[in-house]
Amino acid sequence: MTHSAFRSGLLLALLIGVPFAVGSSPPPPDALLKTMQRELERATRSLGKSDPAPYFLSYAAEDRDAVTIVAVNGSLVASESARRRQADVMLRVGTPGLDNTHGASRPSGITSGMLPLENNPDATAHVLWQLTNREYEQAAGAFLRVKTNEAVRSQEEDQSPDFSQEAAKIELGGTVLPFSLDQKAWEDRLRRISAGFLKYPDVYTSLVLLQGGTARSYLATSEGAAIVEPSTIVRLVIEGETRADDGMDLLRVETFQAASASQLPSESELMAKVDKIGTDLKALRSAPPADPYIGPALLSGRAAAVFFHEVLGHRLEGHRQRDEREGQTFTKKVNQQVLPSFLTVVDDPTLQELSGVKLAGHYDFDDEGVPAERVEAVENGVLKNFLMSRMPITNFNHSNGHGRRQAGLMPTGRQGNLIVTSTNTVKDSELRARFIEEIKKQAKPYGLYFEDIQGGFTLTTRALPQAFQVIPVMVWRVYADGRPDELVRGVDIVGTPLLSLNNIILTGDTEQVFNGVCGAESGQVPVAAVAPAMLFSEIEVQKRAKGTQRPPLLPPPGLKTAPSPTHTADPGGVGR
C-alpha cells in the first residue's frame, strides 16, 4: 500500500527527522568530501573487477547538529543539542537498462550507517569501506533475483530503463552565515509563550517547540558529481489538544518557518497564536459533530493547497506511472484535460519564498545531484509533465530535479513547492457571496467552509480504492437563509481524484502557503503547497473516527482562571 501523509509539524518526532544543524562550527566543506571522493575512487577500481560489476556508486552524507527547545505550560521540558553524521552508500549492478533496483528490489540500492563526528579521514574511510562491502553483497544478490524474475514473469508494460543518464554537476555550495541563536533568551521566551495555555484549562496537552540551525549535505558519485549543499532553517511549532465529551480528540497546530530566529514572529504575535488556539479548542469542544454531507464547499487557500498536494500532487510523482501496483490515475492522460481550464499547477523547488513566506520545499539540488527545476505539470487544465527522479518512465527519459528522500532511503520523484494558480478569480470578499449563491442554486440548507486544515493522506495503489482523505480542523456551516455560521467538528473531506478535481468552479485572488512534512516511500521530506481559496460545486465529507475515552475527570491543578473569549472570524477570511 502506498500511503502518503502531509502534516504541518504535528509531532516532535517529525521535526527531529528534518535535517538541522547548529552549535560548533562545521568542518571545512571540502574535508569530508575529499575523503568520500578518495574512498569512492578506490572502491570503484576494486569492485570493477567483480562479477557482477557495479556501473554506478555514490556516497551521500549529512552533517548536522540539532538544537531543540520545548516548553510546556511555562516550563522547559527539553533544551538540547545533538551532533549527527550519517552516510548512505548507493550502488547499482547490471546496466542502466536493468539493475538491482528494478521493481520491488529498489531498497537493495542503499546501505546506511553513522560516520565519525570528527573529521578523521581514516576513520571515515573505514566506515565507507564497511558500508560499501555490505551494499555490494546486497545489490549483487538482488540483481540475481531481478534477472530470475524477468525470465519467469509477464512482460511489464513500461519498458523504460532503471536509471537515467544525467550530466554530472560539481557544486561546492556557498558560504552559510553563522547560525545565531541566543539559547537562554529563547528558553525564557518559550516559557512565557507556553504559559499562555494555562488560561485554557480545557487544553489538556500543549507544547511550544523551537528547532533550528544549519546543515550540510554531501554527494559524490562515480559519474563525477560532487555537491556540497548548505542550508539554514528555523521552525517554531505551537500545538494544543483537547477532547470533547464524546471522546473526540481535537488538535490545533501553528507552524512558522524562517531562515533565522530573528525572522520569526514577535513574542506578542506568538502569544496571540496561543490565544487563538486556546479559543478555537474551547469552541470546538462545544461544537456539534458534523453529519455526512455532499454539496457546495469553500476551501480557504491553505485547505485548497493541502487538497491539491494530496489529490493531485502524489499522482504526478514519476515512479507511480511505471509501478504496476499503482493506480496510475494520470499515466495515460498526458496532453489531456485533467483540471478545469482556468487552473495551472507547477512544482518549483527553486523558489525560496512567496509573498514573504519562506517555502519549506526549496532546494538547489535534489538528492540524486540533479539541479532543481520548475516543472509545469498542468497548464490551463492540461497535463504536461510529471515530477521525475532518475527513474525514467515512458516518454519521460530524464530527471527534472525531483528525486528526493529522507536519509537512509532510496530517492523517488517527490513534490517540492506545489503551486496552483487560477485565471478564473474574484476578490476574496466576493467569493463568499458566490458560495451562498451556489448553495441556493442547489437548494441546500447550508454549505461547508473549510477554514483551516491539519493534513491528509491519499491511497494510490490498485489494491485499494483510488481515494483521499483531507483532515480539516476548523469547519463552518454557512446557511443559505442568513443564519450565523456554525462551527462543527469531526469532519473529513473524502473522495476520488478525477471527480473531485473537476468540481472546482471559481477561485479567490490571494494565494496562501501551507508548509509541512510529507511522508511517502522515500521518507519524510519538507514541502510547501500554495493555492488560492477555491469554490467547489460539490465535496463529500464523512464523520471522523473518534475514541471512547472521556475527558479527564479530575480538573487540572493550579491553572489560572480561563477567560471566556468570543470567537471571531479572521480579518480577511474568505469564508465568514
Language-model segments: residues:
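Bacterial N-terminal signal peptides
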Residues: G9-P19
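Hydrophobic alpha-helical bundle architecture
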Residues: G361, T421-L499, N515-S522
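Short linear motifs in exposed loops
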Residues: P230, L387, L487-R489
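Bacterial N-terminal signal peptides that target proteins for export
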Residues: M1-L10
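C-terminal, non-catalytic macromolecule-binding modules
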Residues: K384-E438
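Active-site bordering "gate/hinge" segments
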Residues: F20-F365, V370-R374, E379-V382, N395, ...
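Residue-level structural signal for beta-strand termini and adjacent loop
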Residues: R252-T255, S389-M391, G490-V491
